[in-house]
């Protein structure tokens, strides 16, 4: 392992010990904000520190085995050779793990996420599939113990959604879901198809990270056009009595957000503003990412919603992830929320890309 990497790991080990000592300090325990921040830092350091300690132990085992080679006993020397071989394999494995753990973290990975699902080409069938994707993400959120809240929805005439925006709250939500952005294509026989022909429909998914209030971008009220209208969604007679639905247009960017799922206009406005902030931030993030990644690919899809990332073929029970040439014949499980079978390999490929970029930067 490079000396510069060893020095970095030694610094993290030292910092881990400092944080542990601070967490036992009475003044820190009394300051809940500082205690929470240090606890979070400690948990973030824990995995890499444990990996480095294991690496140091494997290094010590290797040196000890090398010393055994000086023994007169032939059997001891043979045993030493085996131990040297095992220690080298372990060191190689731990070094690879540590390289991944040291990769620069996306600061937004631990934030909540907004998922926008929009029916594209395919009419009613596209709307129905948008509903299927919403159900898939709901199941995945449930499996991860995340909370899911519908921010805005526009139902399809024959089921599903023309558009739905949901907020997913929970640790690591954006970090996992960000790979879902892009075009999702479905191939299946619609229920309304009497000839049994397979139709192809498309749905676009955009995943954005929530912008914490403390980091919220400044939105000038003068740049906003706010319209109120009567909700067209569920709500019984109430929807006919008040203009509780909100449409906010951000004039400089042309971004439009509608929220009508809450009975209160105040709540709809608050939800619309949080989605608007996320969309504006997503535009800024994309500009920055384009500048940084102009020379290499990214598995986190760009703002180009036409970019096809995945195909769901129902007659064959097949899911094809186009970014990494992954094909799985377990469509039912995926539609029931077993997304880790796809997101895991995507994450690994993303890490490999980051490692390659890091190696290029280091010469």
From Swiss-Prot:
<dbReference type="InterPro" id="IPR004373">
    <property type="entry name" value="RF-1"/>
</dbReference>
<keyword id="KW-0488">Methylation</keyword>
<dbReference type="GO" id="GO:0016149">
    <property type="term" value="F:translation release factor activity, codon specific"/>
</dbReference>
<comment type="function">
    <text>Peptide chain release factor 1 directs the termination of translation in response to the peptide chain termination codons UAG and UAA.</text>
</comment>
<protein>
    <recommendedName>
        <fullName>Peptide chain release factor 1</fullName>
    </recommendedName>
</protein>
<keyword id="KW-0648">Protein biosynthesis</keyword>
<dbReference type="InterPro" id="IPR005139">
    <property type="entry name" value="PCRF"/>
</dbReference>
<feature type="modified residue" description="N5-methylglutamine">
    <location>
        <position position="237"/>
    </location>
</feature>
<keyword id="KW-0963">Cytoplasm</keyword>
<feature type="region of interest" description="Disordered">
    <location>
        <begin position="284"/>
        <end position="306"/>
    </location>
</feature>
<dbReference type="InterPro" id="IPR000352">
    <property type="entry name" value="Pep_chain_release_fac_I"/>
</dbReference>
<dbReference type="GO" id="GO:0005737">
    <property type="term" value="C:cytoplasm"/>
</dbReference>
<dbReference type="InterPro" id="IPR050057">
    <property type="entry name" value="Prokaryotic/Mito_RF"/>
</dbReference>
<dbReference type="InterPro" id="IPR045853">
    <property type="entry name" value="Pep_chain_release_fac_I_sf"/>
</dbReference>
<dbReference type="Pfam" id="PF00472">
    <property type="entry name" value="RF-1"/>
</dbReference>
<dbReference type="Pfam" id="PF03462">
    <property type="entry name" value="PCRF"/>
</dbReference>
<comment type="similarity">
    <text>Belongs to the prokaryotic/mitochondrial release factor family.</text>
</comment>
<feature type="compositionally biased region" description="Basic and acidic residues">
    <location>
        <begin position="284"/>
        <end position="296"/>
    </location>
</feature>
